[in-house]
Each structure stands twice: as structure tokens, then as C-alpha cells.
Amino acid sequence: MNKIIVFETTRLFLRQYKDEDFSALHSIFSEEETMRYYPAPFSMSKTYDWIERNQSRYKSDGFGLWAVCLKETGQLIGDYGLVKQTIDGRIEVEVGYHTNKRFWSKGFATEAALACKASKYCRP
């Protein structure tokens, strides 16, 4: 899969997940504090499934969670985007994001949210 940039901000670019993102994503998803609102941190298997599920969503839904990368270095620092959830028997679209703990409190999630809001990719 090629590096497909979905949209950019001053400091970030958001792109589709690649299989090579596993290590960076697993370091985020296996961190207990980051995953405190999930039943448990992700195993390696769950992280692989997460990548595959979002790659499928790009094709089926036209959106999903995208890799959030620093423009300056290309480093993946988290993900951000839209996902479908079933709530009370209805399919709803929600905003989701995860950020590597080292990058908390730097405004990256807000920056990604504002760019997403202005993007055609955040209009399901």
C-alpha cells in the first residue's frame, strides 16, 4: 500500500495505515494509560486486526482512522478519524483518536480535529 496522505496541517499529515505501522501503533495500543477506556490494552493480534479493519474501512466506507504523522520527521504519533459504531441498534459515526503518550498536551489531537472537520474525508 502506498503512502496516501488524506490531509495535512501545519505540523502533521494524516494518511492511510500501512502494514509497516504495526510497531508504532502497538506501542500506543499496548500502553495501559492510553487505553484506559478500553477493556484492556491491545495484544499484538488485536493491533494487527486494528490495522486490517481500518484498511478495509477505507475501501468500504471511504473513511476510518488514519495514521497521524509529524511532518518534520514522518514519525507516526497516533491516529485520528471516523468510525462506525452500533449504538442502540443504529449505526452511528463517531470521532476517534489515540495519541502516543509522549505527544500528549501538545495540541496535536485538536489540530487533527480541526483539519478533519474542514476535510471532505470527515463527511460520511
Language model regions located:
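Glycine-rich acyl-CoA binding loop
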Residues: 105-110
